[in-house]
């Protein structure tokens, strides 16, 4: 059953990690945007949509290693995943700048709820960055082990 997993190269494992990190980051973004300090605010759907698209691109890279090997689409898939995840990071950070400003630079405005919100947001951004790093690593390695 897991023979396909044994045949994966470094890029295959990095792509799986990238998909998992993207999923975790997306879940953190949704939780951070809908609970706690930001419970009543509107949620920007771009990071959610872009994370789902990046996950689908990672799955495509792992599912079709023979067809994408030495093809320009292989590089394009990873480039698109990096761009989508980078835009997600930018939107995520942009939506949390007021919380970070209140917490770090205006001592009278800092609250425990904002501190918790900011801590969770930082964890989400870290997972997005880890997904980007996984995509970059996958770009420099082979998806399938050489026979």
What are these regions (language model features)?
Residues 69, 97-99, 130, 134-147:
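Cytosolic juxtamembrane helix at the C-terminal end of the final transmembrane segment
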């Amino acid at each position: 059953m897991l023979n396909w997993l044994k045949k994966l190269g470094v890029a295959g494992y990095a792509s799986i990690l990238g998909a998992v990190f993207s999923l975790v980051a997306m879940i953190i973004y949704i939780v951070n945007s809908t609970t706690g300090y930001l419970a009543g605010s509107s949620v920007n759907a771009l990071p959610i949509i872009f994370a789902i698209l990046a996950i689908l691109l990672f799955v495509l890279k792992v599912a079709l290693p023979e067809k994408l090997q030495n093809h320009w689409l292989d590089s394009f898939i990873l480039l698109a995943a990096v761009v989508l995840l980078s835009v997600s990071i930018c939107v995520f950070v942009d939506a949390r700048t007021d919380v970070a400003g209140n917490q770090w630079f205006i001592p009278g405005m800092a609250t425990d709820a904002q501190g918790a919100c900011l801590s969770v947001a930082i964890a989400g951004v870290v997972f997005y960055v880890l997904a980007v790093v996984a995509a970059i690593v996958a770009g420099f390695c082979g998806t399938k082990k050489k026979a």
